[in-house]
């Protein structure tokens, strides 16, 4: 009897030791650099995050170092009109958010997130070099204006410039959908303590994005305006190289998720099988399934079907981001053009209008720590949720604040135009003596809107997407930015056409236009979007595959 008790005791001790050994390793299916289950103590978690944060910070500095002031480069250096420059910038930015679909498919189906980020970083860097050359080599950029005669870019000059820009767009397509998911992969979803840290990771990930954006909005824009575009584009190119190096330095600490096959193929199989069976009658002998048992295009697994259902439930939430992106895109285009016609001098120092974008990013740098350390613990007392607000609640708050931002922009423009009329500056197009710092609230509010909407969206699509489609769903979420930029470009084109002689957005002199009407139009679109989002959010059922 004693020997039996001893044997049971030994078995219990052995089982306890096995359980403790298992807890030493991540249990979410990830592997380390050697292909083994990753040891929690030496891989992933916050240990791996500094390298991912540094990579994202430097890459975003490079991207925004181009994007923040690109409209000024088109108008001043390439001698484009305001409308043409805005279209070029919005189309390029839209493409930067369409290419993530390519990167996501490659990551989920073939290379995994790590190698996708690595390979597309090389493409990105090549594009940065081409863009820098187009601004530095005399034969690759248009000659300076002689009086009112401004020569346009030649075919060769345009080819080099746009090749660089669209290589950057392709390169960012392999990074955008993968890096946030790759960072979240460093936290074991089966470990409750690591799940809580992952929610905080998304806040600080967005924080690091905006550190890069802040430097771009201040230092880089100032360099571009005062020291030229050669140096202004060279610095972002160097930082893109640093971003790639930082990512590789963290390799021994990373946890890797294996690619799980093409998610597009899986979705197509479900849709094709559903279509084939839509008109079929239920057979009397349910055991006679023919070749359906071996043909995935005729019979899919329950998991495949549930994954497609999840994607369909995400569509209304996804679509709400399109109008938000229309509003948010104005900080790179028409906010800048508005600021260009306002008083921008402090003594002898002239403020570049794109520099006001620093207040968009400054609001993020202020809001994220306050949200993560103050608001979340406070709200947690009332909601009982570890993360404070749900992802959908965060997104809804962001939509509302973005409308406030455009409302303030419309009011500022109304005052500016009235002042232009009072001082007889409408026809001359001279600077209106309204201080550019009146734009600060609209930039600050839009930055705060991003903290709520973008971070909520990143976390929502990561948590609610099937495991095999995480990169794809991240890219799908980013696609709303593309559609928002394209829609904004379309709205500008339609407004310019329909407003005729009384053009709301004139080619050269916005004192003679009605940019305020355009901003009020966007306020209306955003206001309609909010109740639609709330309706579908209430109906949404949270599920995991």
Curated annotation (Swiss-Prot):
The modification Phosphothreonine is found at residue 116. It is found in: Membrane. Its main location: membrane. Expressed in roots. GO terms for cellular component: plant-type vacuole membrane. It is a multi-pass membrane protein. Belongs to the major facilitator superfamily. Proton-dependent oligopeptide transporter (POT/PTR) (TC 2.A.17) family. This is Protein NRT1/ PTR FAMILY 8.4. It comes from Arabidopsis thaliana. The gene is NPF8.4.
